[in-house]
Amino acid sequence: MSDNWIVQNLERALEIWNEKLAEIWMIITQSPENFKGGSIWSVITSIHGALQAIGYALLVLFFVIGVMRTCGSFAEVKKPEHAVKLFIRFAIAKGVITYGLELMMAFLSIIQGIISTIMNSAGFGTATTTVLPTEIVTAIENCGFFESIPLWAVTLIGGLFVWVLSFVMILSVYGRFFKLYMYTAIAPIPLSTFAGEPTQNVGKSFLKSYAGVCLEGAIIVLACIIFSVFASSPPVVDTTATAASMVWSYIGELIFNMLILVGSVKMADRIVREMMGL
């Protein structure tokens, strides 16, 4: 590492960015069951199990409401075709509540497989690191005291931007992970609405929303891969320009690429909704 304070500041900012990018890849490819040693998952499954009892009670309530609204009289309920239809609906709704956790984890496993396929197809097992070009390091180290004064301001502003973007991006990824926990914990309540025809849209909306949260992981990985390709081909540095101009041009282009990545990560939910019509 260079002894120059300006170079160290830029390299430290890029190091934090690379650390957060690597952390994103680790989180995206990790199962909620193994996250933080599985302690959070054990709490979530306990809550899910406790809410199943409430889900069964709501199952009966929504089933009765559905029967009352779809059947004009008790005589219609006694008809074989109506009775079979109601029985099948009740059985499916009960099965969805009982095995809801397994179904949700199976769907998440499918999405994790899609993410792994995307990463392997693109040839990115890990995130590509962003490195400060040697031309800029040499230009900064050759600057005198007065020439380096503008560089202090440029590197401080640029480093601060990189720090902020790093934490905004990782917070968005953690937010998606915590949404998976919340959906899993509360699942028995919305799934119980499948028991009644008038309330089944609530359950459908829940499953669509959960599918969207899972698919956000694939969008985030795609955004990281695109950024990694940008990072692997560093911006062209004009060696004839002054050191301040070189650094300002490099930081400006770097922050622009980072803003695109952070924006894509933060808007992953919106992109999924627009693509899948959720």
Model-derived features with residue positions:
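Short amphipathic alpha-helical coupling elements at transmembrane boundaries
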Residues: 23-26, 82-89, 116, 120, ...
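Hydrophobic alpha-helical transmembrane segments
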Residues: 53-65, 161-162, 180
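Hydrophobic transmembrane alpha-helix segments characteristic of membrane transport
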Residues: 58-94, 186-200
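Non-cytosolic segments of integral membrane proteins
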Residues: 94-186, 224-277
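Alpha-helical transmembrane segments
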Residues: 191-208, 240, 271-275
